[in-house]
Amino acid sequence: MNEARARIIINLRLSMDSLMRVFSHRSPPPSFGFACDVGAHPSSTAQNLPMTYGSVREMIDDFSIVFGVPKYRTSKPKKVTRKFSFTRLLQPIDNLVTCPACSNIHPSDTICDACYAKVHQLTSEIKKKMMQYNPYVGEKQDKEVYVKFRGEPDAPAAVVKGKRVLEIEKERPTWFKKLTLKE
């Protein structure tokens, strides 16, 4: 019964709105809201029941927020104008520096691409050697690693103690930091 009364009030409100639109030639006025008690007390059963609609129009009016999408597609030229408008001018990059090692230009807050490629190649080589020993462990190895390049003297036993020695068949690059050989 409460739902029937609520439905009647909603239908009455919608018909009043449509009548006001017909008789007024200006913009539509704000919709009327009835302040009345639909039930004696708020019933929990009315809230649990699924909403039933008398027509498709009532359903559309109730869910009008769902249809808040653009009516027409934005054309391709309009999108391109937004993207490449004259207001979007090119900005100069002012944080470029020259790499002291290889003379390449790069942003001041990053490492040079050419230098990074050299470091990446050497570390990849070291990782491959580590994985040849025990490929099932993955990145986390069971022992620490001491890297020995060709032409280097043997490290003291105290430095190598408990570590796996990886021998690389190339000279140590000048930029590759030597580990301290203190006991």
Swiss-Prot record:
GO cellular component: mitochondrial large ribosomal subunit
Residue stretches spanning the membrane: none
Keywords: Metal-binding, Mitochondrion, Ribonucleoprotein, Ribosomal protein, Transit peptide, Zinc
Record InterPro entries: Mitoribosomal_protein_bL32 (IPR051991), Ribosomal_bL32 (IPR002677), Ribosomal_zn-bd (IPR011332)
GO MF term (any one): structural constituent of ribosome
Sequence positions that bind Zn(2+): C99, C102, C112, C115
Main location: mitochondrion
Pfam families: Ribosomal_L32p
Any single biological process term in GO: translation
Subcellular location: Mitochondrion
UniProt record similarity statement: Belongs to the bacterial ribosomal protein bL32 family.
Primary role: Component of the mitochondrial large ribosomal subunit (mt-LSU). The mitochondrial ribosome (mitoribosome) is a large ribonucleoprotein complex responsible for the synthesis of proteins inside mitochondria.
Description of how the protein assembles with itself and partners: Component of the mitochondrial large ribosomal subunit (mt-LSU).
Protein name (Swiss-Prot/TrEMBL): Large ribosomal subunit protein bL32m
Taxonomic source organism: Caenorhabditis elegans
Designated gene of the protein: mrpl-32
